[in-house]
């Protein structure tokens, strides 16, 4: 028996497909999402509809984004779902979520069992639309969830942690074992809730500066800030912002990275 075949569909490795089949896990995820009629519900990667069906039972309509044309066609001909679904057959990395929100006239509620091979870049894509998103619930590799939620001095704290926590409050929901999927992945999974801040706790004037800073710092995470950020700040300039130059990237809080990004932004403005 080919364990990559589920409900007659062969899971495609290039799309990172692993299909959820554990009913108790499905029920727990849908309860966490708590979809309601009238809300702008968007699912990324509905696959064979394990989450789509129970969510659709609770709403009048929803949008699904599915790259796999065979799965999109399957959903379009589904006897129960076809009348409720707006199917967008394209790569979620190319979707304008602000336009989707504008069409519905309200912020989106986004959820999905994200393919592990695109989960991090897809979240960075979604962060640029947080003004149009009410909340997000994602099934991810457990390691990625750890990176999302970890704080300074934590083993998993990194650039993803800083950028995600800049935009969103992040709440772990539940852990999911490999046996809950077909085919079973080689890693544990977890569900996480991301709620974009209505008011950013540490506003940054130029987000490109925060992106630059975190890339420089975490790409050389074993170096001290004196070395990794030495081309941008002297030890004295770091000290003026309350940062010890002998610290490493993982020791610096989101607030302090935002403070440094604003210093860089002000410096750029003064040079213009």
Curated annotation (Swiss-Prot):
Give the molecular function GO annotations: 16S rRNA (adenine(1518)-N(6)/adenine(1519)-N(6))-dimethyltransferase activity; RNA binding
Q: Which Pfam families match?
A: RrnaAD
- Source organism (scientific name): Sodalis glossinidius (strain morsitans)
Q: Which UniProt keywords apply?
A: Cytoplasm, Methyltransferase, RNA-binding, rRNA processing, S-adenosyl-L-methionine, Transferase
GO CC annotation terms, alphabetical: cytosol
- State the protein's name: Ribosomal RNA small subunit methyltransferase A
Q: Which gene encodes it?
A: rsmA
Which InterPro entries does the entry mention? Answer: KsgA/Erm (IPR001737), rRNA_Ade_diMease-like_C (IPR023165), rRNA_Ade_Mease_Trfase_CS (IPR020596), rRNA_Ade_methylase_Trfase_N (IPR020598), rRNA_adenine_dimethylase (IPR011530), SAM-dependent_MTases_sf (IPR029063)
Quick one: which residues bind S-adenosyl-L-methionine? Answer: 18, 20, 45, 66, 91, 113
Purpose of the protein: Specifically dimethylates two adjacent adenosines (A1518 and A1519) in the loop of a conserved hairpin near the 3'-end of 16S rRNA in the 30S particle. May play a critical role in biogenesis of 30S subunits.
Cross-referenced Gene3D superfamilies: Ribosomal RNA adenine dimethylase-like, domain 2, Vaccinia Virus protein VP39
Q: Which SMART domains match?
A: rADc
The record's section on HAMAP family has:
16SrRNA_methyltr_A
What reaction does this catalyse?
Answer: adenosine(1518)/adenosine(1519) in 16S rRNA + 4 S-adenosyl-L-methionine = N(6)-dimethyladenosine(1518)/N(6)-dimethyladenosine(1519) in 16S rRNA + 4 S-adenosyl-L-homocysteine + 4 H(+)
What Enzyme Commission number(s) appear in the record? Answer: 2.1.1.182
Q: Establish whether keyword Cytoplasm is in the entry.
A: yes
Predominant localisation class: cytoplasm
The record's family statement is: Belongs to the class I-like SAM-binding methyltransferase superfamily. rRNA adenine N(6)-methyltransferase family. RsmA subfamily.
Q: Where in the cell is it found?
A: Cytoplasm
């Amino acid at each position: 028996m080919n364990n990559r075949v589920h409900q007659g569909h062969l899971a495609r490795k290039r799309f990172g497909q692993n299909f959820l089949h554990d009913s108790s896990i499905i029920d727990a995820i849908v309860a966490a999402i708590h979809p309601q009629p009238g809300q702008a519900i968007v699912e990324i990667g509905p696959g064979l509809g394990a989450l789509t069906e129970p969510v659709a039972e609770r709403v009048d309509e929803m949008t699904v984004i599915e790259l796999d044309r065979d799965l999109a066609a399957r959903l379009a001909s589904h006897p129960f779902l076809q009348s409720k679904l707006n199917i967008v057959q394209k790569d979620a990395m190319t979707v304008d979520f602000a336009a989707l929100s504008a069409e519905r006239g309200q912020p989106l509620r986004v959820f999905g069992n994200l393919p592990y091979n695109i989960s991090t870049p897809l979240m960075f894509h979604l962060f640029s639309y947080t003004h149009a998103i009410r909340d997000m619930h994602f099934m991810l590799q457990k390691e990625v969830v750890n990176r999302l939620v970890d704080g300074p001095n934590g083993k998993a704290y990194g650039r993803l942690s800083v950028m995600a926590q800049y935009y969103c409050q992040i709440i772990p929901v539940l852990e999911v074992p490999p046996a809950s999927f077909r085919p079973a992945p080689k890693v544990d999974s977890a569900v996480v809730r991301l709620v974009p801040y209505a008011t950013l706790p540490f506003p940054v004037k130029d987000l490109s500066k925060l992106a630059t800073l975190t890339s420089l710092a975490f790409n050389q995470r074993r170096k001290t800030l004196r070395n990794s950020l030495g081309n941008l700040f002297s030890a004295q300039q770091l000290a003026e912002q309350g940062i010890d130059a002998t610290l490493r990237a993982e020791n610096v809080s989101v607030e302090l990275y935002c403070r440094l990004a604003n210093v860089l932004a002000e410096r750029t403005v003064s040079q213009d």
